[in-house]
């Protein structure tokens, strides 16, 4: 299965039990910042934004004082899982990033999608990739 298929069929799909509700944007990005696959709506990000995200996975709490920036959008960092998941909030939307062995799985959402739904979609795919050694 291609990386783009994972984004299209597992991240940008309807959320279980909520037909028509889906993430706003999604991507799979290598630890080096190279995009493996992305939705058409995923923001163009700067290398320093990806560096900050990778630093936070290695040094949890790094982004808390400044916020998480992606594509020029600032998210307030909220509770996540140290070294495994970063979650951010901005207004009625937010972001979930799950770290796997080789990549980061991104999901960005706006209402009516809830933070919990975004977490479920992103973390399920990330956990699957971890189980596969990816």
Swiss-Prot record:
It is found in: Cytoplasm, Cytoskeleton. It comes from the Eukaryota. Keywords: Actin-binding, Allergen, Cytoplasm, Cytoskeleton, Disulfide bond, Phosphoprotein. A motif (Involved in PIP2 interaction) lies at residues 84-100. One of its GO terms (cellular component) is cell cortex. Disulfide bonds join 13-118. Phosphorylated by MAP kinases. Transmembrane segments: none annotated. PROSITE patterns: PROFILIN. One of its GO terms (molecular function) is actin monomer binding. The modification Phosphothreonine is found at residue 114. InterPro entries: PFN, PFN_euk, PFN_sf, Profilin_CS. Its main location: cytoplasm. The variability of the residues taking part of IgE-binding epitopes might be responsible of the difference in cross-reactivity among olive pollen cultivars, and between distantly related pollen species, leading to a variable range of allergy reactions among atopic patients. Binds to actin and affects the structure of the cytoskeleton. At high concentrations, profilin prevents the polymerization of actin, whereas it enhances it at low concentrations. Occurs in many kinds of cells as a complex with monomeric actin in a 1:1 ratio. Belongs to the profilin family. This is Profilin-3. It comes from Olea europaea (Common olive).
């Amino acid at each position: 299965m291609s990386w783009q298929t994972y984004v299209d069929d597992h991240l940008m799909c309807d959320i279980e039990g909520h037909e028509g509700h889906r993430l706003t944007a999604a991507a799979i990005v290598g630890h080096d910042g190279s995009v493996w696959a992305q939705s058409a709506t995923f923001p163009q990000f700067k290398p320093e934004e990806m560096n900050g995200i990778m630093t936070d996975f290695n040094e949890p709490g790094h982004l808390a004082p400044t916020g998480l920036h992606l594509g020029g959008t600032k998210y307030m960092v909220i509770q996540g899982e140290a070294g495994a998941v970063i979650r951010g909030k901005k207004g009625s939307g937010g972001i979930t990033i799950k770290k796997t062995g080789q990549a980061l799985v991104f999901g960005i959402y706006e209402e009516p999608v809830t933070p919990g739904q975004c977490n479920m979609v992103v973390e399920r795919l990330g956990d699957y990739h971890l189980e596969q050694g990816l």
